[in-house]
């Protein structure tokens, strides 16, 4: 269970915004070009509500079950699913205005589009790419990305708007930013190549608490921040009885 307080969240969020502003200045970018997503994994809705009150309107979750439990408890937020999505859980996400960051295979694209068709809605998604070829991370390979984007865009109720990646962890004592930056650069190059054929592939969801500066330098349009806003994670997923 989280031990952060409301005051901690507002203070930490301010520090994150300062880091983003400094990184954008160094990259000759506007801070408005980078969307900060607060990842509330394991943290209670009370802290998510405080983040929204402090102006952090975009929130992310790794698990579908935790996402669905928190959504009705946090007014005014825009939600993102940033963790792996099982095909049988697709029906639980579609129709809730959730941006899925983890589209990684054609069968999942089919499941999302099929459910969206039933609800007569459009499901937005990002294709997750395993740019570091890390077996511990999800996502399609760089070589598979083009075909997956092409496949998904033919589905009438699915809109692919960009790419997402999670780079490999640095080695012991390594600098997260220096370790991650080549992978962020690779995703940016892939996005640029895909945009020539698929102009709607705009967004780059990359960068977390430890390496957001490197992500901004390489063109991230979305960064996923957990610990730097909400403090250390709890030992397990948040449960409704803990609110």
List where the protein language model places each region.
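Conserved acetyl-CoA-binding loop of GNAT-fold acetyltransferases
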Residues: 219-223
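Glycine/alanine-rich phosphate-binding loops at beta-alpha junctions
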Residues: 227
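Conserved alpha/beta-domain cores
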Residues: 1-210, 216-218, 230-235
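Active-site loop ensemble at the mouth of alpha/beta enzyme cores that anchors a bound cofactor
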Residues: 236-243
């Amino acid at each position: 269970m989280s031990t952060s307080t409301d005051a901690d969240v507002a203070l930490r969020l301010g520090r994150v915004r300062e880091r983003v502003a400094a990184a954008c200045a160094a990259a000759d970018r506007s801070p408005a070009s980078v969307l900060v997503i607060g990842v509330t994994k394991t943290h209670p809705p009370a802290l998510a509500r405080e983040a929204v009150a402090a102006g952090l309107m975009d929130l992310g979750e790794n698990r579908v079950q935790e996402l669905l439990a928190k959504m009705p408890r946090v007014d005014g937020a825009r939600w993102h699913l940033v963790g792996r999505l099982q095909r049988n859980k697709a029906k639980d996400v579609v129709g809730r205005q959730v941006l899925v960051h983890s589209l990684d295979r054609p069968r999942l694209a089919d499941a999302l589009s099929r459910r969206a068709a039933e609800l007569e809605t459009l499901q937005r998604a990002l294709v997750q790419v395993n740019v570091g070829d890390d077996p511990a991370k999800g996502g399609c390979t760089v070589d598979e990305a083009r075909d997956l984007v092409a496949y998904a865009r033919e589905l009438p109720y699915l809109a692919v708007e960009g790419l997402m990646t999670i780079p490999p962890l640095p080695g012991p004592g390594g600098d997260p930013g220096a370790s991650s930056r080549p992978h962020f650069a690779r995703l940016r190059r892939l996005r640029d190549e895909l945009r020539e054929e698929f102009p709607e592939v705009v967004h780059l969801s990359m960068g977390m608490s430890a390496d957001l500066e490197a992500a901004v330098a390489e063109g991230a349009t979305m960064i996923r921040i957990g610990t730097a806003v909400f403090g250390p994670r709890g030992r397990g997923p948040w449960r409704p009885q803990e609110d």
